[in-house]
Each structure stands twice: as C-alpha cells, then as structure tokens.
C-alpha cells in the first residue's frame, strides 16, 4: 500500500513534466528569424545584407530598450507605438511573435531580426531588433537556463552608419535562475569576445537580470574590459530587484550620449529605457 501512495505523486509529477515539455520546441542550435513588413524568413544561424541603408538620422540615433513581458498586458501595442515613435532602433526582450505583434510590425513598417530561443503554441519567443533598415549582419546566441532548461537569447548585429562606420549592437536577455555566476559569465563572454577585435562604436543593452552584487560586479568588469561605459538615466525608473539593483542596462562606446530616461509604464513588468546618441564625427 505504501508503494501505491508514493507512486501516485510521482506519476502526477511525471505527467505534469511531460505536459510542460510538450508545449515547447527548442532549436538544437541558435536560430535567427528575419522579420519584415511583408514577410517572415526561414530560421538561420546568421543573416547578412552588406548593402543595407544607414541606421542613424543625420548623425542622431534614438534607441528604445524594453522587456515587453511577452505582450501579456492589454495596452502593450499602444505604449510600444508611442515609445517607438521617434526611435531608429528598438531592442526588445521577451518578445512573442504573436499574430497581433506581427501585425503591429507590419502596420508600422519595421524590419528586423529575432533570436528564436524557443517556440510555444506555435509562437516564436526571444529577443528582437527592429529598425527601418536591416543590419548588415546579425547572429543569434542562446544560453540554457540551468534549472528551467529553457534558453535565454541574444542578438549580435552590425548596422551601417552615415559616417561610414559600422555600429555593433548586442541585444541581451541574460540567464536568470542560476546558482552562482558561471552560466551568466559564459553568456556574457560569448558575446563580448566578438567585440575585442572591433574598434568602432558599440551598444550593449537589454535585460541583464543583474539581481545580485556578484552579477553586477561581473557585468561591470566584463563590459569595462571592452571599453564600454554605462548609461546613467534621469529620471531613473528602471525596474529593480527587491534589493534595489536595476535589471536593465545600456552600455556604449564610441558615441556621444545626449539624453537617457527610464519612464514609468504599466504595459510591462519592466519600465522602458529611452536613449539618444549622436555620432562623434
């Protein structure tokens, strides 16, 4: 009889786990999906388009960075439309490629790339870069959450600038549930290693899940090692962990910072980051 009492919870747990994993499709390697105002491309590891147009507008580059919480709140599209109105580049985390989101991209004339971290109920999830122009190249990166076993994603991309340079942009959603910082460091180093031989301007931004002093120290050290400095926001309403540490950041080099603010929004569980840069030349 005792065996039966023990078996029932185990069978229920096994059934629940099987049901959980039946929902998700995880690519065997990082995949990048191109998203245009007219179509969605087939998954690739990297994308190349050397003849892309320039990203900035007469030397000005406006940036929106936002974890949009899988578009779970009813007013996401209204807020995203308003916040993206004067931006040249959107770096979004926790973006689900729902029919409503595809329609929003189409209606507003955005183009871009999404890292296909996983698929659930037929909808791709992962970070996404949106602009009015395509990058000259972009690659997807993923890192498994060690406990949940679902990947977090990132995009490494390059965009043409009007001064003849290329801008490297890293859009990152960092691993969250880890014991220690090993997986966190692995994810950062894989992306930052791509920057070590690049001498031009760089933006690294996203949801870094920097909820501990150890993570913050590692983040600061790694970004400083490639010559990046952190954007300071005013007002600074960035979403914080219970200990007051901010989760979202923007780092840069080779650009002039003109303005940075983190307003309050109820359209996500994260507040958006708005940054204005100007080219140095």
Swiss-Prot record:
Instruction: Give the GO molecular function terms.
Output: catalytic activity
* Keywords recorded for this protein, A-Z: Cytoplasm
Quote a single Gene Ontology cellular component term.
Answer: cytoplasm
> InterPro entries attached here?
Endo/exonu/phosph_ase_sf (IPR036691), Endo/exonuclease/phosphatase (IPR005135), UPF0294 (IPR022958)
Q: What is its main location?
A: cytoplasm
Q: Where in the cell is it found?
A: Cytoplasm
What organism does the record attribute this protein to?
Vibrio cholerae serotype O1 (strain ATCC 39315 / El Tor Inaba N16961)
Family according to the record: Belongs to the UPF0294 family.
Pfam families, per this entry?
Exo_endo_phos (PF03372)
Kindly provide the name given to this protein in its UniProt entry.
UPF0294 protein VC_2238
């Amino acid at each position: 009889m005792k065996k039966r009492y023990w078996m029932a919870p185990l069978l229920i747990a096994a059934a629940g786990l099987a049901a959980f994993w039946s929902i998700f499709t995880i690519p065997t390697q990082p995949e990048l999906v191109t998203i245009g105002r007219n179509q969605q491309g087939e998954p690739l590891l990297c994308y190349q388009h050397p003849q892309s147009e320039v990203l900035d507008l007469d030397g000005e580059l406006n940036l929106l960075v936002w974890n949009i919480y899988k578009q779970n709140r009813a007013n996401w599209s209204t807020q995203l439309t308003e916040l993206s109105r004067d931006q040249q580049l959107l770096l979004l985390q926790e973006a689900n490629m729902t029919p409503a989101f595809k329609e929003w991209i189409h209606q507003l004339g955005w183009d871009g790339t999404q890292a296909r971290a996983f698929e659930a109920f037929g909808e791709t999830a992962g970070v996404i870069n949106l602009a009015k122009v395509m990058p000259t190249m972009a690659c997807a990166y993923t890192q498994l959450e060690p406990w949940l076993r679902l990947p977090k994603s990132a995009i490494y991309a390059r965009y043409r600038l009007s001064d003849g340079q290329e801008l490297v942009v890293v859009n990152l959603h960092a691993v969250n549930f880890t014991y220690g910082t090993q997986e966190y460091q692995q994810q950062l180093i894989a992306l930052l290693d791509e920057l070590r031989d690049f001498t031009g301007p760089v933006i690294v931004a996203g949801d870094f899940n920097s909820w501990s002093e150890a993570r913050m120290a590692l983040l600061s050290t790694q970004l400083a090692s490639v010559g990046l400095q952190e954007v300071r926001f005013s007002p600074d309403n960035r979403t914080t962990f219970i200990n007051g540490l901010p989760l979202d950041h923007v780092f840069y080099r080779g650009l002039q910072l003109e303005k940075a603010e983190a307003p309050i929004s109820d359209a996500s569980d994260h507040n958006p980051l708005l940054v204005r840069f100007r080219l140095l030349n």
